[in-house]
Amino acid sequence: MVSPAAPDLTDDLTDAELAADLAADAGKLLLQVRAEIGFDQPWTLGEAGDRQANSLLLRRLQAERPGDAVLSEEAHDDLARLKSDRVWIIDPLDGTREFSTPGRDDWAVHIALWRRSSNGQPEITDAAVALPARGNVVYRTDTVTSGAAPAGVPGTLRIAVSATRPPAVLHRIRQTLAIQPVSIGSAGAKAMAVIDGYVDAYLHAGGQWEWDSAAPAGVMLAAGMHASRLDGSPLRYNQLDPYLPDLLMCRAEVAPILLGAIADAWR
């Protein structure tokens, strides 16, 4: 088992800076776990990555934001979070299958902070998505831009989808739109492919949990891009049931086109 050094307390960091630091720290640990355990037993590797990254993040959040609640994929869901004004929604290892496969770099670490606002519009205010196997690059709400994405609406829309579970609605909207499906692993890697301009959209309709999309959605919206349910309604977080049935993340200019095609497909 990798035993990371005790982290320095960083109480002076802003929430956005802390999110980025947590994502990078967990990413470094996951790379160490990968190197130490190897790929001979994928289940053992994935379990170790999930568990150790989760322990690191929970330990740091307890030390550095002791009054905040946490919703993690790898921890018991303490429903006291429903009364909290600040909830960290984290996925210590997004894409366990990809993490456990040699040569795959499309896995991520998700860190998001949900805050209850006084105007009745709670939202993800700070978030970071790390792609550890790609140089541990971290996409963060306080610095992200959409500059890498191409301008305008392309003739063919490149849409990131699951390699194993492509959404059925995709086949229906292909009747009216020119679409090129692009298979990418984890949810975070798919969403950041939109930020990087590698794809135009990320569409999912097979069901997810809040930790799968909270950080990617926060980063997307901070970059001026679009993130919603497939019917165009907002993505809601810190709900009693953290299940989210579907989502669309895309460049802002293609959102009306895709939402319209999806609505037509459902009629």
UniProtKB/Swiss-Prot annotation:
PAP phosphatase and IMPase activities are inhibited by Li(+). To a lesser extent, PAP hydrolysis is also inhibited by Na(+) and K(+), with IC50 values of 150 and 250 mM, respectively, so much higher than IC50 with Li(+) (0.5 mM). Exhibits about 50% residual IMPase activity at 5 mM Li(+) and about 10% at 30 mM Li(+). Na(+) and K(+) have no significant effect on IMPase activity between 0 and 200 mM. Its EC number is 3.1.3.7, 3.1.3.11, 3.1.3.25. The gene is cysQ. Keywords: Hydrolase, Magnesium, Metal-binding. Mg(2+) 1 binds at E73, D91, L93. Mg(2+) 2 binds at D91, D94, D212. Phosphatase with a broad specificity. Its primary physiological function is to dephosphorylate 3'-phosphoadenosine 5'-phosphate (PAP) and 3'-phosphoadenosine 5'-phosphosulfate (PAPS). Thus, plays a role in mycobacterial sulfur metabolism, since it can serve as a key regulator of the sulfate assimilation pathway by controlling the pools of PAP and PAPS in the cell. To a lesser extent, is also able to hydrolyze inositol 1-phosphate (I-1-P), fructose 1,6-bisphosphate (FBP) (to fructose 6-phosphate (F-6-P)) and AMP in vitro, but this might not be significant in vivo. Pathway: Sulfur metabolism; sulfate assimilation. Mg(2+). Mn(2+) can substitute for Mg(2+) for PAP phosphatase and IMPase activities, but is less efficient (50%-60% of the activity observed with Mg(2+)). It catalyses: adenosine 3',5'-bisphosphate + H2O = AMP + phosphate; beta-D-fructose 1,6-bisphosphate + H2O = beta-D-fructose 6-phosphate + phosphate; a myo-inositol phosphate + H2O = myo-inositol + phosphate. Belongs to the inositol monophosphatase superfamily. Optimum pH is 8.5-9.5 for PAP phosphatase activity, 9.3 for IMPase activity, and about 10 for FBPase activity. IMPase activity shows a dramatic decrease at low pH. In contrast, IMPase activity is highly stable at alkaline pH, with more than 60% activity remaining at pH 12. It comes from the Bacteria. Pfam families: Inositol_P (PF00459). It is an enzyme of class 3 (hydrolase). Induction: When comparing gene expression levels of the four IMPase family genes in exponential cultures of M.tuberculosis, the level of cysQ is the highest, almost equal to sigA; impA and impC are expressed at approximately 40% of this level, while suhB is lowest, at 12% of the cysQ level. Homodimer. Disruption phenotype: Strains lacking this gene show normal growth, do not require exogenous inositol for growth, and show no differences in levels of phosphatidylinosotol mannosides (PIMs), lipomannan (LM), lipoarabinomannan (LAM) or mycothiol (in the absence of exogenous inositol). One of its GO terms (cellular component) is plasma membrane. This is 3'-phosphoadenosine 5'-phosphate phosphatase. Substrate binds at E73, L93, D94, G95, T96, D212.
